[in-house]
Amino acid sequence: MRFFLSPPHMGGNELKYIEEVFKSNYIAPLGEFVNRFEQSVKAYSKSENALALNSATAALHLALRVAGVKQDDIVLASSFTFIASVAPICYLKAKPVFIDCDETYNIDVDLLKLAIKECEKKPKALILTHLYGNAAKMDEIVEICKENEIVLIEDAAEALGSFYKNKALGTFGEFGAYSYNGNKIITTSGGGMLIGKNKEKIEKARFYSTQARENCLHYEHLDYGYNYRLSNVLGAIGVAQMEVLEQRVLKKREIYEWYKEFLGECFSFLDELENSRSNRWLSTALIDFDKNELNSCQKDINISQKNITLHPKISKLIEDLKNEQIETRPLWKAMHAQEVFKGAKAYLNGNSELFFQKGICLPSGTAMSKDDVYEISKLILKSIKA
């Protein structure tokens, strides 16, 4: 049997709702199911406003634009993340400043303070990624952004269904972004959602997402926009998937605990932040890891760190499992270490490099059974002990 990292898992009503869309012949972007999808996300997250889009990247791009980010503005960002979290900074020709992570996989608060203090000019925004569904230290980060008048944009692409102090991740900042990509906890095959506190700004983002067409009989444009809206067909899938979101979160968390049970003697599993609930989008584990290795040392590095290699056991494990039709991956390679960002300013402590070297993402599909996880775990132990 083949095991993927995080495959789609349909809830039951997807085909029913898609059939309704086809019967209506309204298969273009926008429509009843897009509206229902937005309403379901608002209800679940308790966010004031929601805008369905074709990706979380589009959501982050629009958030930056309506936040007023322009060329040469400074945007702070998590370094330990996927490139889609930070690429929109480049779309607007702004300057990313990368911040390394702490023991939660998320932005190190002390490094964030240092970056703000030393920036050549006041940063315009912070894109904060909640990696693998884990909550960042929101009390401190929200306060820091408030004190320094920095727009907080939460990249909650991996964190739908995650909470901190009973508040949904993505709803702490001025804007939040969720992903419905094919590998996320629920999916529309491809899609995203921008949520936010300010209705006027979300409506401005909505305007930009539909090519910035003015309200005229003809096509009139006073500004440029994008083709970022979501299809009504995909909206129908989203409505059905939102119906089973909580079930998926509980199953992801169960899978994580199974891995801890079977692999805990040989791997380390990071704890959740106190008063938080991670959706455990992907179960991640660290080999030959000691928490004392984590570095709180602060240093400012202005060059990319390119010579980072995987732990030999991780490289071997990924290949061994691939031969068994089991998909795994290393943890994200940090943005400051990517060639495309060579020369970008970064505040580092070495933690993201350590996690990349020693970490692995394990199969986390919500259709898996405990027996499946046990069999995968046996193969993992066989590989690392060989």
UniProtKB/Swiss-Prot annotation:
Citing just one GO molecular function, the answer is: pyridoxal phosphate binding
Q: Which residues carry this modification: N6-(pyridoxal phosphate)lysine?
A: 184
The chemistry this enzyme catalyses reads: UDP-N-acetylbacillosamine + 2-oxoglutarate = UDP-2-acetamido-2,6-dideoxy-alpha-D-xylo-hex-4-ulose + L-glutamate
Which keywords does this Swiss-Prot/TrEMBL entry list?
Aminotransferase, Pyridoxal phosphate, Transferase
Give the EC number(s) listed in the UniProt record.
2.6.1.34
Pathway assignment reads: Protein modification; protein glycosylation
* Named cofactor requirement(s): pyridoxal 5'-phosphate
The knockout outcome noted for this protein's gene is: Cells are impaired for flagella-mediated motility, for invasion of intestinal epithelial cells and for persistence in the chicken intestine.
Q: A GO biological process this protein is involved in?
A: protein glycosylation
- Top-level lineage group: Bacteria
CDD domains membership: AHBA_syn
What result is annotated for mutating residue 158 to H? Does not affect catalytic activity
Q: Where does substrate bind?
A: 25-28, 56, 179, 227, 325-328
Family of the protein in this entry: Belongs to the DegT/DnrJ/EryC1 family.
State its role. Answer: Aminotransferase involved in the bacillosamine biosynthesis pathway by producing UDP-4-amino-4,6-dideoxy-alpha-D-GlcNAc (UDP-2-acetamido-4-amino-2,4,6-trideoxy-alpha-D-glucopyranose), a precursor used in the production of the glycan component 2,4-diacetamido-2,4,6-trideoxy-alpha-D-glucopyranose. Required for host colonization and virulence. Involved in the N-linked protein glycosylation pathway.
Q: Which PANTHER family match?
A: DTDP-4-AMINO-4,6-DIDEOXYGALACTOSE TRANSAMINASE (PTHR30244:SF34), TRANSAMINASE (PTHR30244)
**Protein name, please?**
UDP-N-acetylbacillosamine transaminase
Q: Which organism is it from?
A: Campylobacter jejuni subsp. jejuni serotype O:2 (strain ATCC 700819 / NCTC 11168)
